[in-house]
Amino acid sequence: MSKNSEFVASILESCEIKFELPPVILPGKGVCITDTANMLAESYQDSHAEARLYNRGNAVFCVTRDSNGAMLNALSSQRACSEFELVSTLLKIGQSGLEKTICSPATAKTIISSSTFLNSIPKINLVTNSPVILKNEDNTCRVVNSYDATSGILSTGIPAEDVPLDEAIALLNNLLSDFNFQGAGDKSRALAALLTPALVSGKVLDARAPIMMLQADKSQSGKGFFTKLLGAVYNELPSTVAQRTGGVGSIDENLDAALTLGRPLIVIDNLRGKLNSPQMEAFMTADIYSARIPYSEPAVIDPRRYFIMATSNNFDLTPDMANRSCFIRIRKQRRTYSYQTFPEGNILRHIKANQPKYLGAVFAVVKEWVRLGCQTMPFSDHDFRDWCSALDWIVRNILHEVPLMDGHREAQLYTQCPDIDWLQNAWKYVSALGSAKEALTAYQVAECCDCGDMELPGAQGIPLHKLDDNGTRQVCSQIGRRFNKLFSDLGEDDEIHLSAFSLVRENKKVRYPSGKSDMATFYSFIPAA
């Protein structure tokens, strides 16, 4: 025990006053900041978990609640003055001994900034409104329903139900049954999205998850509704990050504000136009991330515990951002489609009323994966390889769905070059006419498209055979320009590789009937092996 600690102990022992809360002597007259910090830390250790102060990336946070549940807030020195009074009786050394007092913001700042206080309070990484599943070393799982010092997670909410695996798979499929996914691979990725927060929050899967980009062909297709369903499974209302074109608050600032709340789910809503955020790209790959907090020290955050979704009908991504994303394409249901109904109302209300069961369904799949040894696929067609190989194995071998990345390459490329849709339609007609593998000129590609009733660029809706020479040249020129843009945006060494086919471009010398020769560009559609 230091001399200062002995001095403080002797003062407290000589005091005959009985205090309802543990006594804490503020610095001054022989009491140093370290002594006060130690006394306060002990007071917080004896308090209820949600009343404690926590160390999050060497910044002090407190747990608060709103209508959406628990969250973290950076503790300001002004607020610390009253927070200290909730767990202790604040004292100072007066002329006649110990006297009750209040803490000034300046004194509070010295305490919460001291390494002694920061190292004495518990660490926290995440606050959730539902239990969190963790992995044991013996390929079993445990579920956290309160504060867990090892993981730094404070979980609240109702415990998850134990759900048999077969029932769990049926529940998750039923949850998605009203969505009109563009392809079977999109459903696999939607199932992966439902599982990912459970896998990464407690680091059962210690890997970075990509941003889940929900693309819709039309308004009201269900992309935003999907984020609400996923949030309901975890008893969370995802923190929303808005993309603003003017005024205060950039998307980077809004992301930092959402991250500091400590809630695991974040939604970037209704992206439009070009998304170019180096800060967000850094967050998706950095091992640690420093989130800026107004009027406080930055908080160091572990990005691997967070799950970000984004919704859009039409947006452009940089190649780096596209590589950090996983795309789920949703089509709008026909007007006459009949959606599921439940005693509680729609599927969202049903999940909220039965949240412990749906979370139990997610946990059942996670437990089965852990029981089987956390196996992964030997290869991955995504830059986030660890996440992709694990979720690909789960959706194939436990959920019995198609491979995770089916159709993903095209969805990814579409955000960089919307002409990819035109190229896929051209491939469909070239293949149907038996011209695959043949070297075709722009005019021959136009003939294939015209036979399939595909509108030709530059033709203004007129069929190819009805165009005059100038119109035909215009169509061929437009097709050539479209191919050039595709190769410029997506090509590597005059090749574009998609899931179903590759497009190869080559220049050849052509001899015409007149005897003249010239260089011409040919395009070959090569089916995938």
Q: Can you describe what each PLM-predicted range is?
A:
Residues 215-218, 225, 237, 251-256, ...:
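DNA transaction DNA-binding modules
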Residues 134, 142-165, 172-174, 302-306, ...:
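Phosphate-sensing "switch" segment of ASCE/P-loop ATPases
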Residues 185-200:
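N-terminal pre-Walker A segment at the start of P-loop NTPase domains
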Residues 232-243, 287, 490-492:
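Post-Walker A helix-loop "phosphate-sensing" segment adjacent to the P-loop in P-loop NTPases
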Residues 1-185, 202, 253-254, 258-260, ...:
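N-terminal nucleic-acid engagement/recognition segments and initiation subdomains in replication
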Residues 262-265, 288-290, 303-308:
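Loop/turn-to-beta-strand initiation segments
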Residues 276-300:
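Conserved catalytic/switch belt of AAA+ P-loop NTPases
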Residues 264-285, 314-323:
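Conserved AAA+/SF3 P-loop NTPase catalytic/coupling segment centered on the Walker-B
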